[in-house]
Amino acid sequence: MLKAGVFEPARQAPDFSLASSAGHELKISQYRGRVVLLAFGFTSCTEVCPTTLNTFALARRKLGPAAAEVQVVYITVDPQRDVPARLAKYLGSFDPTFIGGTGTEEQLAAVRKSYGISAEKKTIGNDYSYAHSSFTYLIDRTGRIRALMPYGHSPDDYANDLTILLKE
């Protein structure tokens, strides 16, 4: 049984085209045949985002060789700072297979809207941060959104759900 909230019925994950941290075009549809963890955040985040990405890395390790069939896709909410090279360095500190996506404000707003993600820029003195949705989409091998995992779940919960989706 999935630990995450289940989408019933499952729906196709909205596709998008962004610049990837690997230097090519990023589309969610390119990962058909693999299970995807899709999350949104930003590299300057100090709490939720690094905790989530570390959880993904630990969950993938628990899967052993099956981890090769899981792709983490992390879409920034901060295009001013999160250029592809910065995303690559940041994500690589958690797991070198993680892929980040960035684009223009307009492109990212459209992707967020299609996934129901909110992100609000907050000014803090001379700096800024973001308040944003912190759940993760679990997308199956056929590109369907199967579940939504809220922030705070353990690596074991993710490994459980990924194992179920990988067996389908």
Set out the residue ranges of the language-model regions:
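A short beta-strand-turn-helix
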Residues: 16-36, 60
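Sec/Tat-exported extracytoplasmic proteins
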Residues: 11, 35, 60-67, 98, ...
